[in-house]
Curated annotation (Swiss-Prot):
One of its GO terms (molecular function) is catalytic activity. It comes from Arabidopsis thaliana. The keyword Nucleus does not apply. GO terms for cellular component: membrane; nucleus. InterPro entries: CCR4/nocturin_mRNA_transcr (IPR050410), EF-hand-dom_pair (IPR011992), EF_hand_dom (IPR002048), Endo/exonu/phosph_ase_sf (IPR036691), Endo/exonuclease/phosphatase (IPR005135). Coiled coil: none annotated. PANTHER family: CARBON CATABOLITE REPRESSOR PROTEIN 4, ENDONUCLEASE_EXONUCLEASE_PHOSPHATASE FAMILY PROTEIN. Keywords: Calcium, Membrane, Metal-binding, Transmembrane, Transmembrane helix. This is Uncharacterized calcium-binding protein At1g02270. Ca(2+) binds at residues 397, 399, 401, 408. The lineage of its organism: Eukaryota, Viridiplantae, Streptophyta, Embryophyta, Tracheophyta. The chain crosses the membrane at residues 25-45. It is found in: Membrane. Gene3D superfamilies: EF-hand, Endonuclease/exonuclease/phosphatase.
């Protein structure tokens, strides 16, 4: 078990544990696991009588035929007992007050995870403040061959993240922690791992896949002013990934991020990640589009709303990814547009709402700053910084004449966050690279499953009570890619 303390006032803290350096030029950034087969659990926890699990395997022949190179990931927000309400009339009564309840529920969670036997398990809302529960997870997971990494949220929030790596599948090269030290005391784990079994890149060469596992849990959007905080959290993760790749001279690698993103496919975080070349693995497996937000759910929140918020994001190798800062600015402008839409302000009226007298008028930098306050992006403790505001102004003043006019507003209003295609293509293993092409190993999504099964149909079963989140498992297979 790792115990950590927050000893810095920096907005983002990076801590690392270095394990032997890696040498292969072909690396992967992924949140993965080797699952023997997708599994549905039926009749699970329908009442208080703690009936044993009834298990139904899907495609049982898959287990024996699956090649060793297949990998998969399980991500699951297990609902910390300190947050689980047990009395709807008295919200101050939590499961953490009743040992028999939280002990039994978490044992059923462990039964599910150990039966799946994913090579990487990423958990959120682990009750790290309770030694008995922590020991329970560490003992059972380590006894089953997992190495465990744990990270508490800052400011003694009581819960945190846990990532378990199966020793039969991955060797840990490097482990780092990100402490955002922001409004929500959120954190992230990054693990650089390498496959134990080499992957045949071609007929002459075997390589060990190198992988980065990212596990995180973003802030819940209690109100629209927190949109910028959530965007900051994702930006910090992507910014650090870029720095890590540069520091270790890593090129052409897939990246997978997983966790509870506390936002749906309609949100700014989703669009931001899509603009950086990421795909939702679950949607890719089921051939859903970005507009298919209603097809599946993974969470019923404390307000009783059901939505899809748990993702395993995949970004395959590419040299043509849009600059991160460009995507960031586009995402902030998207928030401004959303806030105006939410206030029922159309494009024709937006300019006057922001402070202009009419369409022939223009806004100075001071006017622009006041406009940002109106849409909850500045003037609040967790809003845009001075430097970010200046950068936004430079991007808004397209012609560089020192003022912001209506024509520039229209261009921003009509701007869309385009999903960024890559310049690497999947190739058959026997194919030879052309001049100017580089070889890389990418990932192909084979299968993605939500448990409980009803969540895949956009429904939430009333008898499901091991968490307020669904468990998501995605299976990948490595593919050769040629990057031009």
């Amino acid at each position: 078990m790792q115990s950590h303390q927050n000893r810095s006032r920096l907005s983002l803290i990076l801590r690392s544990r270095f394990i032997p350096s890696f040498s292969s030029p072909l690396s992967l950034f992924v949140v993965l696991a080797a699952v023997p087969l997708p599994i549905y659990f039926s009749g699970l926890l329908s009442g208080r009588n703690n009936k044993p699990l009834s298990v139904m395997r899907l495609n049982s022949n898959l287990a024996s035929s699956m090649v060793e190179s297949n990998i998969s990931c399980t991500t699951f927000n297990i609902l910390a007992p300190i947050y689980k309400r047990v009395d709807q009339k008295n919200h101050s009564t939590r499961e953490s007050d009743f040992r028999t309840l939280w002990l039994a529920r978490n044992q059923r969670i462990l039964d599910l995870l150990l039966h799946q036997r994913s090579s990487v398990i990423c958990l959120q809302e682990v009750w790290v403040g309770n030694e008995e529960l922590v020991n329970m997870y560490h003992h059972q997971l380590s006894s089953s061959g997992y190495t465990i990494y744990q990270l508490a949220r800052t400011n003694s929030r009581g819960d945190g993240l846990l990532t378990a790596i199966h020793k039969d599948h991955f060797k840990v090269v490097n482990y780092r922690e990100l402490l955002f030290n922001d409004f929500g005391d959120r954190v992230a784990q990054l693990l650089h791992v390498k496959t134990v079994i080499p992957f045949p890149l071609n007929g002459k060469q075997d390589v060990q896949q190198e992988v980065i596992i990212v596990n995180t849990h973003l802030l819940f959007p209690h109100d629209s002013s927190l949109s910028i905080v959530r965007l900051h959290q994702v930006y910090k993760i992507l910014e650090y990934l870029e720095a890590y790749q540069k520091e270790n001279k890593l090129n052409h690698m897939p990246i997978i991020l997983c966790g509870d993103w506390n936002g749906s496919k309609r949100g700014h975080v989703y669009k931001f990640l899509r603009s950086q070349g990421f795909i939702s693995s679950y949607d890719d497996a089921h051939q859903y589009t970005d507009s298919d937000a209603h097809r599946w759910v993974s969470h019923r929140n404390h307000r009783g709303n059901i939505c899809g918020v748990d993702f395993i994001w995949l970004c395959n190798p590419s040299d043509s990814r849009k600059p991160l800062r460009t995507s960031w600015v586009e995402a902030v402008f998207s928030i401004i547009k959303y806030q105006l839409h939410k206030a029922s302000i159309a494009e024709d009226d937006a300019f006057t709402f922001l402070g202009a007298k009419n369409h022939s008028d223009s806004l100075t930098y001071s006017d622009f700053c006041l406009a940002l306050q109106k849409v909850n992006l500045t003037g609040i403790p967790h809003g845009l910084s001075f430097e970010e505001t200046k950068e936004l102004w430079v991007r808004a003043d397209l012609d560089g004449n020192g003022v912001f006019d209506y024509e520039e507003l229209k261009k921003i209003w009509n701007m869309t966050m385009v999903n960024q295609p890559g310049n690497c293509k999947e190739s058959v293993m026997e194919s030879k690279k052309e001049e100017g092409e580089d070889e890389a190993i990418g990932l192909k999504v084979n299968k993605a499953i939500l448990f409980p099964q009803e969540a895949e149909k956009g429904l939430w079963p009333e008898n499901y009570n091991i968490s307020d989140h669904a468990c998501l498992t995605v299976q990948f297979s490595p593919v050769k890619m040629l990057c031009s």
